[in-house]
Regions:
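Accessory RNA-recognition modules of RNA-modification enzymes
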Residues: 1-226
């Protein structure tokens, strides 16, 4: 059975009715068929697929935000399946639990803002320690709005950033915040800096396994740099 109670209505996921192993088998078959029909190649050997957790794995996503006048309520989430309507959801099983449990409190918070009908989206990015939410705003926040956002982020240990136009307008709500996020792989002593809107692998658990697999296949010598 699906791990999310909104599966079937929400368009964010499409394969939760399959077991994890069945999803992998389906995707592998589709990949092999693409290689044969489009690439005109057939691999001699196919490694076993890399597996990761089935829930709370998506450390980067973009939520739509919409104030619905008829409900007098701000909705935050993904579109309904094959629809422009926004799913009325209070949790999401594929994002980190920290983000999932904040969906409903965020809706209540945004409903109090003076520009609640001028916020089209939130883009979030998480690493091992920080949870950043980039709030797209079409009008300036009032002083009261800023105070409310600061109180919320301090209490819930997240960081609000704002975006007024393009990506070059993104900035932390509090100027003292570090504007770069660190992704670390302790096993291989790797540390990368990135921005909340940078393109990254949304599943950090898969990253770890991918690097282990690549290193095992390459078998680099001590004097070789990868």
């Amino acid at each position: 059975s699906p791990i999310c109670s909104f599966y079937g209505v929400c368009g964010g996921c499409s394969m939760q009715h399959f077991r994890g192993s069945s999803q992998l088998a389906y995707k592998q078959r589709a990949f092999e068929e693409t290689l044969q029909h489009v690439g005109k190649v057939r691999p001699e050997t196919i490694l076993s697929p890399i597996e990761g957790p089935q829930h709370s794995y998506r450390h980067k996503a973009r939520f739509r935000v919409k104030f619905v006048k008829k409900k007098n309520k701000v909705l935050i989430g993904f579109n309904e399946k094959k629809s422009h309507f926004l799913t009325d959801m209070n949790m999401c099983a594929v994002v980190p639990k920290k983000i999932s449990i904040l969906l409903e409190p965020l809706q209540l918070l945004f409903n109090t803002l003076s520009i609640k009908d001028k916020i089209p989206q939130i883009e979030y990015a998480s690493n091992q320690k920080r949870h950043i939410m980039v709030v797209r705003i079409l009008e300036e926040l009032s002083d009261v709005d800023i105070k409310s956002l600061k109180l919320f982020q301090d209490f819930h240990k997240i960081e609000f950033w704002t975006q007024t136009k393009g990506y070059d307008t993104i900035k932390p709500l509090v100027n003292e915040m570090d504007t770069e996020i660190i992704y670390s792989n302790i096993e291989f002593d790797l540390h990368f800096f990135f921005q909340p809107t940078s393109f990254t692998q949304i599943n950090p658990f898969i990253n770890l396994v991918l690097i282990r697999r690549a290193m095992a296949l390459l078998q680099p010598k001590k004097d070789e740099l990868i």
